[in-house]
């Protein structure tokens, strides 16, 4: 009897084991079929640089490029500025929400994509002529401590954030960081000091304009105080001057778009760069030119720099005797031939787009010598 039971148990155990193994095999085959039908990632090839990267399913191409240290061109990362626009040579993508001015229906039909909001559905090949060398600096997440808050204008503060001593945060003048807010929201700001002028303790400088109703700036202007901790991630962006370039430079800023322009000027001065530089800073009224004295001092310290502030709507109380009008139109009046120049523009998207269009059409600026960082607020972004 015991032997019979033992045989039956052996048969049952064997059958159960076979069933389990069969289930595991079928599950593995099902997963393989699902993986083949719905791959977890796609291969994106970048031409003419002949670079490749793996893009996770449902991940925008640009985010994968940043993660891999591959330097695709970009600006806002929100589908608003069009700086990341490139041509899709092969494969298929779908776009997240974006502004028509960044990518029109005609451009999309012609094969152009915005890498900041394009997710691949197949392996793809794209054409991006501005791909620089991969990953010079690592993108880091870190806590920072508010070192100082200075009111520079009625609606502008200069914020200095102390960097943690255990992090080697490196960046180029002109690059930006993201504030990581509660709920995962982010706000981007450009550094206003060059990496050669961090001071002691090492700190980055940011210029914040108050946007009433803004998730971050309402808090920054009403409640932020020294020693508060803010989490950041960076550096991001490719708005930077290369020391190997030799052409005369036009720096074009509107409002707090002056921040990365200031950092670039500091970098040029510390390099001992002798290229002719013109700084045009456009604001609405005199109070908006919140670091006018700094710019005047820079002009005295740099023999190759000419500083031109421009007001679009000066008030009678301003007693303004300087230039008046749209800042990019003042540039065109002063420099009707820009065929041998480089232009670096930062500020409101409307100014950046107008400058890019008009300086090329009316002043002969080569398309590949216009470099831009268009500031986008939450109002400028398109939310899915």
Regions found by a protein language model. Name each.
Residues 138-229, 247, 283-285, 310-314:
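Ferredoxin-reductase
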Residues 17-118, 124, 276-384:
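Reductase modules of NAD(P)H-dependent flavoproteins
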Residues 113-136, 228-230:
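Short, structured interface segments
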Residues 174, 257, 348:
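Short, conserved phosphate/pyrophosphate- and ester-handling motifs at nucleotide-, phospho-/glycolipid
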Residues 234-245:
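A short, basic/flexible loop-to-alpha-helix module at the beginning of a structural domain
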Residues 89-92, 129-131, 182, 235:
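Short, surface-exposed secondary-structure boundary micro-motifs
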């Amino acid at each position: 009897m015991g032997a019979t039971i033992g045989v039956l148990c052996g048969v049952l155990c064997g059958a159960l084991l076979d069933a389990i193994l069969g289930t595991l095999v079928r599950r593995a085959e099902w997963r393989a079929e699902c993986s083949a039908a719905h791959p977890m990632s796609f291969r994106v090839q970048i031409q003419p640089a002949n670079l490749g990267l793996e893009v996770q399913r449902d991940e925008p191409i640009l985010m994968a490029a940043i993660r891999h240290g591959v330097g695709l061109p970009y600006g806002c990362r929100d589908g608003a500025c069009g700086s990341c626009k490139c041509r899709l040579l092969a494969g298929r993508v779908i776009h997240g929400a974006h502004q028509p001015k960044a990518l029109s229906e005609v451009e999309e039909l012609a094969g152009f994509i915005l890498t900041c909001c394009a997710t691949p559905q197949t392996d793809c090949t794209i054409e991006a002529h501005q791909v620089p060398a991969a990953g010079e600096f690592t993108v880091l997440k870190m806590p920072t401590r508010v070192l100082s808050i200075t009111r520079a204008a009625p609606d502008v503060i200069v914020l200095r954030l102390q960097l943690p001593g255990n992090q080697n945060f490196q960046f180029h003048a002109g690059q930006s960081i993201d504030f990581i807010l509660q709920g995962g929201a982010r706000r981007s700001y450009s550094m206003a000091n060059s990496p050669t002028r961090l001071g002691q303790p090492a700190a980055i400088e940011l210029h914040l304009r108050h946007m009433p109703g803004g998730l971050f700036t309402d808090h920054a202007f009403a409640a932020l105080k020294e020693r508060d901790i803010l989490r950041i991630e960076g550096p991001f962006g490719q708005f930077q001057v290369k020391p190997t370039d030799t052409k005369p430079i036009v720096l074009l800023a509107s409002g707090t778009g002056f921040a990365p322009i200031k950092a670039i000027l500091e970098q040029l001065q510390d390099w001992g760069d002798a290229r002719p530089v013109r700084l045009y800073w456009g604001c609405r009224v005199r109070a908006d030119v919140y670091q006018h004295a700094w710019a005047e001092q820079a002009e005295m310290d740099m023999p190759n720099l000419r500083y031109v502030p421009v007001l679009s709507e000066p008030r009678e109380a301003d007693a303004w005797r300087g230039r008046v009008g749209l800042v990019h139109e003042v540039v065109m009046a002063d420099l009707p031939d820009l065929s041998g120049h480089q232009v670096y523009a930062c500020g409101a998207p409307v100014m950046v787009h107008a400058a890019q269009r008009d300086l090329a059409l009316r002043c002969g600026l080569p398309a590949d010598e216009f470099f831009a960082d268009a500031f986008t607020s939450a109002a400028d972004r398109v939310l899915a």
